[in-house]
């Protein structure tokens, strides 16, 4: 992350939310004298990309390798610089340009051509690197106006902290692995063993949904976390 103007060490994890007009250099880093980009400034924190399809496709594509390697290397004629970029990518988007896709009560819909242009900005390989996809449906007025109490943040924090502690203990012998998302193939085989029924369920999902080998590993990592 970036320290405050008055200096001092950081005491909380960074949260970066760049505008969709950002350039690829500003996102991953670079320049004549390379400077870290947003993906390095969000190292060990969260990189939030709001309205994902509004980013230029070329800008989004440069995320693919850093997401895989958790670092980014910038090469220039006389030197090469490597910056860390182990961040949690969180992105949001509307389901269509109008925002009302598949809503029978919506006054506006998008044509198939508009949908194709909109969704084509996000490539399959990039989506394949996002572990969890959640579709959020419209909330009716009755539920919005209800007086409901959600789960307190401190309770959620305790649960997350407990899960992270379990993972830290699990990977105590590894210097470069601290949580499930960082597992390599060997660790996945060791810590994500499936029984026969689970294996058959995963096999069926892989075949019916035409999932990739990368998706297979990520499903196991998320399952281990849950």
PLM ranges: what are they?
Residues 8-14, 25-47, 80:
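Conserved alpha-helical scaffold flanking the Walker A/P-loop in AAA+ ATPase domains
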Residues 16-26, 92:
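Switch I (G2) and immediately adjacent beta-strands of P-loop GTPase domains
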Residues 2, 12-18:
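Mechanochemical coupling/switch segment within NTP-driven translocation systems
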Residues 1-7:
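Walker A/P-loop
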Residues 47-48, 54-55, 141:
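Residues immediately C-terminal
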Residues 44, 50-52, 62-63:
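Walker B catalytic acidic pair
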Residues 19-20, 39-41, 81-83, 126:
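Solvent-exposed alpha-helices and their adjacent loops that cap or buttress functional pockets
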Residues 33-34, 57-226:
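Basic, amphipathic alpha-helical bundle interface domains used for macromolecular binding and assembly
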